[in-house]
């Protein structure tokens, strides 16, 4: 898809209102049969080659910076993560940029023959997309819709080093997991201890009674891409809050015709 075509594509309206609905559309099944996992991996839109390691994930959403960072190790980690996804037959969902760590991980996945879905607000395209876009680009109206679409397409989430935007996206999906809105694993690629201060803060919040031990275990971290993805594969969710978002969302959807009717008749 060309950059011009992506920019001209119509974006859905009511971005903030649809966020919760779209997150619940493609829940991750933790009991997918091995044969089905292998079939999904080979038919998910990427190259898919012989020798790919079997994965329960079809797509992983990667959050990361539009800058490369000062250390070469950050850049190496982005490339290594892209290669790890390729080896496991996993496609990539990301923020759509072609610069910084976003560009490195997306090019690595695309070069390996897997499918890449980039989701980016139209207003950011001139800033974060240079040259020919990588893979499939979906232009959306704003940041709320971007995050909802990324969550909807993904079966798991990984955060590489990044800044405010990366932290916002990361903490939001962690909060959604805590509330039971989704049951998808959330991982930190803790390159050179980049996320140690964040993990220390979270541990402090646990000690001070603001985060439960159970909620602390939502976050999975590892120093290398290979180790992190292995941990994500083994993740089993546990929640103390009984909110089942899919059920609540369905009840809300059933009320929509009644609400519309009431608005029309008033």
Swiss-Prot record:
Matching InterPro entries: LOG, LOG_fam
The question of whether Amino-acid biosynthesis is a record keyword is answered with: no
Highest taxon above the source species: Eukaryota
Region: Disordered; residue ranges are 30-52
Q: What residue ranges carry the coiled-coil annotation?
A: none
Q: What is the role of the protein in this entry?
A: Cytokinin-activating enzyme working in the direct activation pathway. Phosphoribohydrolase that converts inactive cytokinin nucleotides to the biologically active free-base forms.
What broad taxonomic lineage does this protein's source fall under? Eukaryota, Viridiplantae, Streptophyta, Embryophyta, Tracheophyta
Q: Which residues bind substrate?
A: 128, 146-147, 163-169, 175
Query: What EC designation does it have?
Result: 3.2.2.n1
Protein name in UniProt: Probable cytokinin riboside 5'-monophosphate phosphoribohydrolase LOGL8
> Entry's NCBIfam families?
Rossman fold protein, TIGR00730 family
Tissue specificity here reads: Expressed mainly in roots.
User: What's one GO-annotated cellular component?
Assistant: cytosol
Q: Where are the transmembrane segments?
A: none
From the Swiss-Prot or TrEMBL record, what is one GO molecular function term? cytokinin riboside 5'-monophosphate phosphoribohydrolase activity
Give the first-level EC class, as a single word.
Answer: hydrolase
Keywords attached to this Swiss-Prot or TrEMBL record, sorted alphabetically, are:
Cytokinin biosynthesis, Hydrolase
Which reaction(s) are listed as its catalytic activity? N(6)-(dimethylallyl)adenosine 5'-phosphate + H2O = N(6)-dimethylallyladenine + D-ribose 5-phosphate; 9-ribosyl-trans-zeatin 5'-phosphate + H2O = trans-zeatin + D-ribose 5-phosphate
One GO biological process term? cytokinin biosynthetic process
- Respond yes or no to whether keyword Hydrolase is given for this record: yes
Q: Which family does it belong to?
A: Belongs to the LOG family.
């Amino acid at each position: 898809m060309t950059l011009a075509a992506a920019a001209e594509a119509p974006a859905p309206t009511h971005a903030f209102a649809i966020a919760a609905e779209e997150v619940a559309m493609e829940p991750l099944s933790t009991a997918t049969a091995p044969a089905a996992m292998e079939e999904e991996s080979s038919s998910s839109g990427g190259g898919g080659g012989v020798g790919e390691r079997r994965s329960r994930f079809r797509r992983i959403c990667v959050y990361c910076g539009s800058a490369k960072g000062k250390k070469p190790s950050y850049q190496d980690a982005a490339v290594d993560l892209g290669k790890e996804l390729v080896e496991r037959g996993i496609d990539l969902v990301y923020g759509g940029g072609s610069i910084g760590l976003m560009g490195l991980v997306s090019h690595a996945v695309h070069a390996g023959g897997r499918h890449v879905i980039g989701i980016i607000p139209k207003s950011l395209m001139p800033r974060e997309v240079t040259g020919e876009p990588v893979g499939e680009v979906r232009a959306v109206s704003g940041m709320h819709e971007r995050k909802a679409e990324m969550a909807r397409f993904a079966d798991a989430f990984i955060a590489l080093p990044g800044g405010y935007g990366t932290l916002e996206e990361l903490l939001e999906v962690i909060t959604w997991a805590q509330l039971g809105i989704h049951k998808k694993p959330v991982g930190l690629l803790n390159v050179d201890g980049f996320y140690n201060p964040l993990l220390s803060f979270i541990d402090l919040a646990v000690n001070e009674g603001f985060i439960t031990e159970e909620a602390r275990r939502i976050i999975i971290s590892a120093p290398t891409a290979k180790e992190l993805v292995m941990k994500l594969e083994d993740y089993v969710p546990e929640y103390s809050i009984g909110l089942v978002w899919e059920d609540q969302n369905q009840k809300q959807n059933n009320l929509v015709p009644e609400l519309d009717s009431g608005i029309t008749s008033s």
